[in-house]
């Protein structure tokens, strides 16, 4: 319910967040809207996790692996712009990428109508425009520029998803041999694969062999296609996916075929996902679209091309050559080319996750001490709802036992009767000598990090033995 309804409402209010951050466009109104929305969102996180009412919002978000809405709004805006860049026919395209001044048209019309007026009137008019700009929120384009620059998104490399060059009913799909893909790679001996590969070679005895492969190391991406002694390599833009590398290699293979006088070819590739995308005629991917268009043209020119999947790194000579060529292309200069917009979406998600991680590292929450790296916490599925709720409160450090006084201004802070010190979850779990016997029976370690690193079941058993489960 939270993800399906509340998160969507929060995301739709991203413009209010931008305006409030910049102090523009009735900030009091936007601040009130955000407070109401954030309050509902925070309450939903508390209900989902079972956290106590006084739990810090940052800890709630970290425990639920819910990125703060301020960052989420920016992430969604940038992802939308990346998708829009691939669709230039979208009516919003020009406004998003070229509409950086909300008063540009107004200024142009007014200036043309004010020709012949006194210079003092022009100066007064310009001052009026400046004041209007201060009261207006920045446009989507203006807000986006700073975020896109920080994230280093190469908008100029995003390929255009236009209308296909070839009519859909004229597109030809190659024949694909999947006989080697039937066997599970993890359980199949390489010699068995090689035997099946020889059967394929014999079956297509009069076909020339082309081998393709893609390679990725850190941010560097490359691809290669090998036919006899001819190799065609491509160094792709940094950050491209391995799928894009494999698809680029297949396109290079068709280029090798088009330059040859030989008629029959079989392309061997170890990318099952690319073959399936080609078979399904996935025109949403610009590289698959290009491959099918090039293949259709080759077939119309009298070429015969079939494809076959082979496993990688089992000693097939042609595949090993293609793999070596693809790896060597990583040291080449980047080839100017456009790539699908989807390749840059993971980079955006990683950028904002790292930004959130930086925020989290500066927090002093108790959860930040035991959970310094942000990732999804998966509770032991055998725990009951009550036990999961208790575990969440133990991890965040806020519970009814230790923080109920915050809800009642007349209540006093709870004290440990054994140690005469402030009662806290850390004191119960780590320090209090009263529970040393139970601690040594159920938990391993002596430091806070070591004790909280025990299994969920062990921590719950310790709390049960101490008699605190129903008090949290």
Label each residue range with its predicted role.
Residues 23-431, 438-472:
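RNase H-like, metal-dependent ribonuclease domains
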Residues 1-19:
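Basic, alpha-helical interaction scaffolds
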């Amino acid at each position: 319910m939270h993800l399906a309804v509340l998160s969507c409402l929060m995301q739709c209010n991203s413009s209010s967040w931008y305006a409030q951050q910049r102090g523009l466009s009735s900030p009091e109104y936007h601040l009130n809207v955000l407070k109401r929305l954030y309050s509902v969102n925070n309450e939903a996180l508390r209900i989902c996790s079972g956290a106590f009412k006084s739990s810090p919002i940052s800890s709630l978000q970290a425990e639920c692996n819910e990125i703060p809405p301020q960052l989420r709004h920016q992430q969604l805006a940038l992802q939308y712009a990346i998708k829009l860049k691939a669709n230039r026919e979208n009516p919003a395209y020009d406004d998003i990428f070229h509409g950086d001044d909300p008063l540009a048209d107004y200024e142009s019309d007014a200036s043309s109508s004010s020709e012949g007026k006194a210079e003092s009137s022009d100066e007064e008019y310009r001052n009026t425009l400046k004041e209007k700009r201060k009261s207006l929120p920045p446009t989507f384009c203006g807000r986006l520029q700073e975020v896109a620059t920080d994230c280093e998104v190469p908008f100029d490399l995003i390929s255009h998803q236009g209308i296909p060059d070839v009519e859909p009913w004229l597109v030809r799909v190659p024949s694909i041999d999947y006989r080697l893909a039937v066997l599970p790679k993890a359980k199949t001996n390489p010699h068995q694969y090689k035997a099946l590969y020889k059967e394929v070679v014999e079956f297509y005895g009069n076909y020339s062999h082309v081998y393709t492969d893609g390679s990725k190391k850190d941010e560097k991406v490359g691809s290669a296609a090998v036919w006899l002694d001819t190799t065609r390599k491509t160094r792709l833009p940094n950050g491209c996916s391995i799928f894009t590398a494999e698809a680029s290699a297949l396109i290079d293979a068709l280029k090798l075929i088009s330059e040859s006088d030989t008629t029959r070819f079989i392309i061997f590739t170890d990318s099952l996902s690319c073959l399936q995308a080609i078979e399904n005629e996935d025109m949403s991917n610009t590289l698959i679209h290009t491959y099918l268009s090039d293949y259709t043209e080759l077939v119309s020119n009298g070429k015969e091309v079939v494809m076959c999947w082979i496993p990688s790194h089992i000693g097939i000579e042609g595949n090993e050559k293609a793999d070596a060529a693809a790896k060597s292309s990583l040291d080449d200069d980047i080839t100017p080319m456009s790539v699908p917009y989807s390749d840059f979406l993971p980079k955006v998600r990683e950028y904002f996750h790292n930004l959130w991680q930086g925020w989290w590292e500066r927090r002093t929450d108790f959860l930040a001490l035991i959970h310094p790296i942000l990732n999804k916490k998966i509770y032991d599925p055998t725990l009951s709802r009550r036990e999961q709720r208790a575990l969440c409160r133990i991890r965040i450090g806020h519970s009814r036992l230790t923080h109920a006084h915050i809800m009642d201004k007349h209540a006093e802070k709870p004290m440990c009767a054994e140690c005469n010190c402030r009662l806290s979850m850390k004191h119960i779990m780590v320090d209090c000598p009263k529970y040393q016997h139970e601690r040594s029976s159920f938990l391993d370690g002596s430091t806070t990090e070591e004790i909280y690193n025990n299994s969920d079941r062990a921590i719950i058993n310790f709390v049960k033995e101490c008699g605190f489960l129903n008090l949290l």
